[in-house]
């Protein structure tokens, strides 16, 4: 039986939200027969008593308890009955083998300046499937790229992804592309943004309570680093990837957090044919601005030969450092940003985390034409370049 002190400890954890507000379990949240549930990490799970989920129970009793673990536990609650907390326990943690045999470590090669799974790509949001609108804390690595224009005016016209305390990844065409006006200078990034019309951003949750994020963070860019082999005038836009070095380190929060790079050797070589991924953003491009609210869409990776057949009609020859995804009318990277992320999900016995599968490069005009997938730079092909380029 779960000790009363542990019940009190867990309820105390659940009571504190990241915005400083309080949540007390209520009977409306009960699952009478417990049943199936989906974790904050987007895994299939079963709603059971906390003490019956050995992994999460062990996580709870770990000292000190990390903020990310505290928030994960809070958002994993699926009910409260007879004085006991119910927790959404992933299927893989209820298998006897996972409780007795340490899981294998992923085959990862890393630079010490880059965060590893567990430190990046965290999934803390209670995800809504099939929706277009993101949650306020969903995809906290997303960045808006700021340009300083003539007469000192500023605007956001590309996107990017935070990969460490000091670096953002975007597209090279957002740095020195042929469509960029000559009087624009890439000057900064905005992090922790959700609704560009408000600051701070607030969202009303299912309990009718207001959940507010801290004010967004504007950080100057110290140096832009387009890929050395990128050719702005090329039709196929090969090597359309760039690094932005920030002028200062950023502090991670629930709303500003890096995405993982595909460091696992299997991910580095993957082409993602038939794999469903997320594209997200404000629809910002070098020429247009579409939405004040961060949006998302699910897109499916396309076979390269099929995508090549489509783009051959435009005399565009794609290479193995690129990939295609989407092709459904009105979706695709219309909801993403130039330079923004194509987001994959890796589930293994150690961590479940989001990783940067691709960078939005180009697509049909107008975007979202049926039968025309968007083209993305395949980030796994550039891991070596990224690791060799970043500095402390």
UniProtKB/Swiss-Prot annotation:
Glycans are attached at residue 107. Keywords: Calcium, Developmental protein, Disulfide bond, Glycoprotein, Hydrolase, Metal-binding, Protease, Secreted, Serine protease, Signal, Zymogen. Its EC number is 3.4.21.-. Changing residue 336 to S: In EA 12A; results in weakly ventralized embryos with ventral denticle bands that are approximately normal in width and the filzkorper have the normal tubular morphology. GO terms for biological process: dorsal/ventral axis specification; dorsal/ventral pattern formation; maternal specification of dorsal/ventral axis, oocyte, germ-line encoded; proteolysis; Toll receptor ligand protein activation cascade; ventral furrow formation. Changing residue 373 to I/Y: Probable loss of catalytic activity results in partially defective dorsoventral patterning; during gastrulation, shows defective ventralization; in late embryogenesis results in moderately dorsalized embryos presenting defective lateral filzkorper, head skeleton and ventral denticles. InterPro entries: CLIP (IPR022700), CLIP_sf (IPR038565), Peptidase_S1_PA (IPR009003), Peptidase_S1_PA_chymotrypsin (IPR043504), Peptidase_S1A (IPR001314), Ser/Thr_Proteases_Immune/Dev (IPR051487), Trypsin_dom (IPR001254), TRYPSIN_HIS (IPR018114). Changing residue 360 to M: In EA 5.13; results in extreme lateralized embryonic pattern where the most dorsal pattern elements (e.g. dorsal cuticle) and the most ventral pattern element (mesoderm) are absent. It holds the Pfam family Trypsin. One of its GO terms (molecular function) is metal ion binding. Its main location: secreted. It is an enzyme of class 3 (hydrolase). Changing residue 131 to E: In EA 20N; results in extreme lateralized embryonic pattern where the most dorsal pattern elements (e.g. dorsal cuticles) and the most ventral pattern element (mesoderm) are absent. Residues 128-391 form the Peptidase S1 domain. Residues 1-19 form the signal peptide. It is found in: Secreted. Changing residue 363 to E: In EA 8; results in completely dorsalized embryos. Proteolytically cleaved by snk. Activation peptide and active catalytic domain remain associated by a disulfide bond. Processed ea/easter is present in extremely low amounts in the early embryo as it is rapidly converted into a high molecular mass complex made up of ea covalently bound to the serpin Spn27A. Zymogen activation is also controlled by a negative feedback loop from Dorsal. Ca(2+) binds at residues 193, 195, 198, 201. Activated proteolytically by snk; activation requires both activation of the ndl-gd-snk protease cascade and sulfation of a vitelline membrane component by pip. Inhibited by binding of the serpin Spn27A. Changing residue 325 to V: In EA 83I and EA 4102; results in ventralized embryos. Component of the extracellular signaling pathway that establishes the dorsal-ventral pathway of the embryo. A protease cascade involving ndl, gd, snk and ea results in activation of the spz Toll receptor ligand; acts downstream of ndl, gd and snk and is required for proteolytic processing of spz. Activation of ea requires both activation of the ndl-gd-snk protease cascade and sulfation of a vitelline membrane component by pip. Localized activation of the Toll receptor in the ventral region of the embryo defines cell identities along the dorsal-ventral continuum. The clip domain consists of 35-55 residues which are 'knitted' together usually by 3 conserved disulfide bonds forming a clip-like compact structure. Belongs to the peptidase S1 family. CLIP subfamily. This is Serine protease ea. The gene is ea.
């Amino acid at each position: 039986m779960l000790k009363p002190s542990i019940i009190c400890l867990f309820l105390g954890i659940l009571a504190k939200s990241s915005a400083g507000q309080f949540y007390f379990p209520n009977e409306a949240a009960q699952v009478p027969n417990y049943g199936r549930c989906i974790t904050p990490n987007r895994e299939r799970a079963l709603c059971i008593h906390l003490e019956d989920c050995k992994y999460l129970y062990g996580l709870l009793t770990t000292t000190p308890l990390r903020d990310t673990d505290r928030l994960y536990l809070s958002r994993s609650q699926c009910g409260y009955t007879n004085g006991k907390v119910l927790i959404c326990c992933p299927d893989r943690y209820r298998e006897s083998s996972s409780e007795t045999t340490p899981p294998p470590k992923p085959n990862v090669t890393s630079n010490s300046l880059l965060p590893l799974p567990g430190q990046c790509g965290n999934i803390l949001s209670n995800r809504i499937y099939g929706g277009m609108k993101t949650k306020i804390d969903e995809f906290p690595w997303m960045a808006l790229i700021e340009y300083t224009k003539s007469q000192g005016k500023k605007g956001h016209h590309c996107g990017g992804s935070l990969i460490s305390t000091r670096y953002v990844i975007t597209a090279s065409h957002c740095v020195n592309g042929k469509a960029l006006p000559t009087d624009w200078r890439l000057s900064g990034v905005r992090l922790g943004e959700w609704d560009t019309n408000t600051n701070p951003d607030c969202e009303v949750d299912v309990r009718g309570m207001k959940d507010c994020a801290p004010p967004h963070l504007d950080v100057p860019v110290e140096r832009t680093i387009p890929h050395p082999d990128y050719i702005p005038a090329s039709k196929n836009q090969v090597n359309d990837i760039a690094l932005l070095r920030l002028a200062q380190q950023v502090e991670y929060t629930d709303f500003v957090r890096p995405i993982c790079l595909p460091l696992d050797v299997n991910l580095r070589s993957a082409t993602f044919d038939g794999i469903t991924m997320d594209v997200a953003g404000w629809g910002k491009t070098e020429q247009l601005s579409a939405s004040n609210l961060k949006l998302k869409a699910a897109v499916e990776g396309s076979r390269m030969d099929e995508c090549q057949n489509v783009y051959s009609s435009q005399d565009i020859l794609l290479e193995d450092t690129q990939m295609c995804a989407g092709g459904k009318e009105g979706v695709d990277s219309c909801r993403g940003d130039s330079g923004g992320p194509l987001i994959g999900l890796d589930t293994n016995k150690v961590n479940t985390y989001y990783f940067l599968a691709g960078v939005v490069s180009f697509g049909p005009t107008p975007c979202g034409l049926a039968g025309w997938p968007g083209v993305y730079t395949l980030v796994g092909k550039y891991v070596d370049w990224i690791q060799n380029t970043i500095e402390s």
